Regions:
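Active-site-adjacent mobile loop/cap segments within catalytic or ligand-binding domains
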Residues: 13-16, 27, 35, 84-93, ...
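Active-site histidine-acidic residue metal-binding/catalytic motifs
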Residues: 2-73
Length: 192
């Protein structure tokens, strides 16, 4: 088997799994049993769990989390990925529910991957389907989706601010983890 210029075997897809937010800007949150749980806490936990479990031959999985406001677009582009999955959780009014996936408005491959990811996430979570959402660079999540080289999606599996029970949260994270593994299996076996 031949290697690409970046040392990865030809035919292998490099997938970047990005934990959304950082220590400075931790994203949305919920309070469970007096403990504040942030979006960044959960996204870093989620990508680490997936990295431990993922063993697909055709996938070179890179996990990324940030601790500052450096230029994320340049950082992602320097990783020479084929696919970017940016992991987030939603928030609104502590009542909203559902799953949605964002993609760059000009990317037909991003739209296809978003549609596949949305179907898989809603199947695993059983939450209302809020659909896939095209984004422009100035929109929420738009910069990472529109200015990076890989085919990119941003997943919002559920509304974190609507979760009040630790057991439900743990089960939901497990379901999201299983869904992302299924998305990676799709990426491994299919072209976009």
């Amino acid at each position: 088997m031949q290697k690409r210029g970046d040392g990865i075997m030809v035919g292998t897809k490099r997938v970047i799994l990005l934990a959304g937010h950082n220590f400075i800007s931790p994203g949305c949150n919920t309070n469970i049993d007096g403990k504040l749980i942030t979006e960044f806490d959960l996204t870093t936990h989620l990508v680490a769990e997936i990295f431990k479990r993922e063993r697909l031959i055709g996938i070179d999985l890179i996990i990324k989390a940030r601790n500052d406001f450096g230029n994320l677009v340049n950082e992602v582009n320097s990783l020479n990925g084929d696919i970017l999955i940016s992991c987030h959780f939603n928030a609104y009014d502590r009542k909203a529910q559902g799953t949605e996936v964002l993609y760059a408005h000009t990317s037909s491959k991003g739209r296809k991957l978003a549609s596949v990811a949305q179907d898989i996430l809603t199947k695993h979570l059983g939450l209302p389907d809020r659909g896939i959402k095209p984004t422009k660079p100035e929109d929420r999540g738009g910069s990472i989706l529109n200015k990076t080289k890989p085919v990119a999606i941003l997943i919002e599996p559920f509304f974190l601010d609507n979760i009040k029970n630790k057991d439900y949260l743990e089960k939901s994270i497990e379901k999201v983890s299983n869904a992302i593994i299924e998305i990676l299996e799709y990426v491994d076996k299919n072209e976009l």
